Amino acid sequence: MNTTIIWHGHSNFQINANGISVLIDPFFTNNPRCTKNWNEIQKPDIVLITHDHSDHLGDAIAICKSTGALCGCIVGTADKLIQQGMPQHLIIGEIGFNIGGTIERKGVRITMTQSFHTSESGSPAGYIITMPNNFTLYHPGDTGIFQTMKTFGKLYNLHLSLLPIGGFFTMDSYQAAYAAKMLKCKMVIPMHWGTFPVLEQTPERFKNYLKAMAPECKYIAMEPNTSKEL
């Protein structure tokens, strides 16, 4: 069965496979690139948060409280969410999990990875996610490039990577293209661009760098509020 990727803009992705839906960095309210409210999307089974900046944490608490979706996040950020009203029983592990840890819920296998960024609570993180149909993808959250991406490329058969290219707060197009090379992913979708004026406004430079650095990696063109079947 195919995997459907929905991009709600910025770093907000929804991945659907075998009747299970995983939502990552659910930034809907005040997202200038998103045309839907959080209560208009398909009900997620799992919500993953990479870090607690408002453009990533987004509407996670409201979504989980309304839908009963499980929330995956790092220890520390879990405490912050609980203090802000997230029901503790919806937090995976009730206290969160941590970098290097792997959990499995609802047929989805999720490994938390490090990211190089900042967070007001806990540490910034990424996720390597294997859906129930064995489709494996990598969402690093906000990050700069780092050498361990090469290790991820050796350890995991990555069908897809979702890579930030905006620069300023994360790696830019040039670095992200080399990250795709290190990750050895079969496909890549650029993210974290065009949302705010300070970010890279189009993915064209990334597309060109990718062709030069990792020609074996397929570039998947997406615009916010669209979906792709892979």
Swiss-Prot record:
One of its GO terms (molecular function) is hydrolase activity. The keyword Hydrolase applies. It holds the Pfam family Lactamase_B_3. SMART domains: Lactamase_B. Keywords: Hydrolase. InterPro entries: Metallo-B-lactamas (IPR001279), RibonucZ/Hydroxyglut_hydro (IPR036866), UPF0173 (IPR022877), UPF0173_UPF0282_UlaG_hydrolase (IPR050114). Belongs to the UPF0173 family. This is UPF0173 metal-dependent hydrolase LI0883. It comes from Lawsonia intracellularis (strain PHE/MN1-00).
